[in-house]
Every structure is written in structure tokens, then in C-alpha cells.
Amino acid sequence: MKTILVTGSSSGIGKSTAIKFVKAGWNVVSWGRRFKKMEAWKNNLPLTDQKRIFIQCVDVMSASQVTEAIQLIPENFKVIDLLVNNAGLALGKSPIHEGLIKDWEQMIDTNLKGLLYVTKVISPEMVNRKSGQIINIGSIAGKETYPDGNVYNATKFAVDALTRGMRQDLSQHQIRVSQISPGMVETEFSEVRFHGDKKKAQQVYKNMSPLKANDIADLIYYISNTPSHVNVADVLILPTQQA
């Protein structure tokens, strides 16, 4: 039985991915900052599925938490076949001279450093086994800049570059590294970006049909099931109304 580790799985894409894979028969290690939210969706699943999910409260911004969490994973979940680096966020949307340093730091610490911390503790065992797969969740914001996106754009451009570098480093060890770069996905993303302002967040998706978290989970599952000689390097996925 294969095992997937998903970061940022309290809600949104991470939650949908965890549920998708456990229903497909995988073991799932679910990491997120909001333990009760993970516990709630886990408890809504059939008991047979619940037994194949191990949830941990982990903030990927903390290298020490990440290192400690790995040590606490039960033996039957320890061999990670697929790592999905999903944890990420945008905070604020303002010109560079009006941005908040605390927002910048949290985006850099989560979107970039968090991805590095998790990859650092998972990838060595993949190298030893000469097998494994890593899927990084990037963004269209890592392909194109937009006004007031500045630091968020920078973190996602960095994820794009890091994914390419990881693929170059790890391909010799038969490890596949992919990136999924979504456009607008209707999750808590915009509400978080606007510091809990729900009205402002709702305007982001006005007069359009955005992607859903399940759309990205389906794509992750598809990539995970390609033959071992196939590496889907990068996928840009957009709502039909976003061009």
C-alpha cells in the first residue's frame, strides 16, 4: 500500500487531496496547522478510511516542528511514496511601498522555506530507495506577475525555479518532481489574503466559475498514476473564464 504526505491539509486543496487518496486506497499522512479541522473531516469518513489517515498538527514554517513530526509518524506510514507540498498562502494585496513586513515574512516562510523544510526531511529516504514522487503546488502567480502581487509573486516564482532545480537534482535517483500551477481556485485563499474580509474575498470570484479544490486533487491523482518513466513536469490549470 502506498503512502502520501500532504501539507496544508486542514482545508482546501490539501483536504481534498487527502480524501481523494484515502478513498483510492492509499495511506495518508495529513499535515496542517488546524488539527480540529483535520480531525473533523477525517471523522466524517468511513472507519475503514479513517484507519489509513494519520493527522499531525504541523506548521511548516518551523523547521524543528517538521523534523519532530517526521519522527512521530507510525511505522506503517513512514515510507512516503508521494509528497505533496501544498501548504501556501497569500497575505495582502498592495503596492510594494505599502506592504506589511509581517505578511511578507509569513509568505516567504510558508511558501518557500516551508516547502524546503519538508522536502529536506522526506527526500533523503526517496534517494535511498531510488523511488518516489514530489508534487509542488505552485500558481499562475509564479508564471505571470500582476499589480500588487509583488512578494506573493516572488515566492511562487521561487517555487517554480525550485521545482526545476529539484527535478534536476533528483531525476538521477528515479524521483519524479512535478509542479501544478493553478489559476483561481475557490478555497479559503482569498479570505486569508484579505485578512478575513469575506466580502472582499467573494468579489474575487464574482461573475466567473473558479476551479474547485477537487479539480486540483483529481489532477494530483492523475499525475501520481502515470507510469514511472513519465514525469509530468509542469501543469498550468485555469478556469475556462480565466485567460
PLM features: residue spans?
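Conserved glycine-rich cofactor-binding loop
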Residues: S10-S11
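Conserved glycine-rich Rossmann-like NAD(P)H-binding loop of the short-chain dehydrogenase/reductase
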Residues: A24-A40
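The beta1-alpha1 cofactor-binding region of Rossmann-like NAD(H)/NADP(H)-dependent oxidoreductases
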Residues: C57-A69, I101
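Substrate-binding pocket helix/loop in short-chain dehydrogenase/reductase
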Residues: S94-I96, D103-I108
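Active-site helix of classical SDR
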Residues: T119, T155
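Residue(s) in the substrate-gating loop at a strand-loop-helix junction
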Residues: S139
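C-terminal helical subdomain
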Residues: Q179-I180, K199-A243
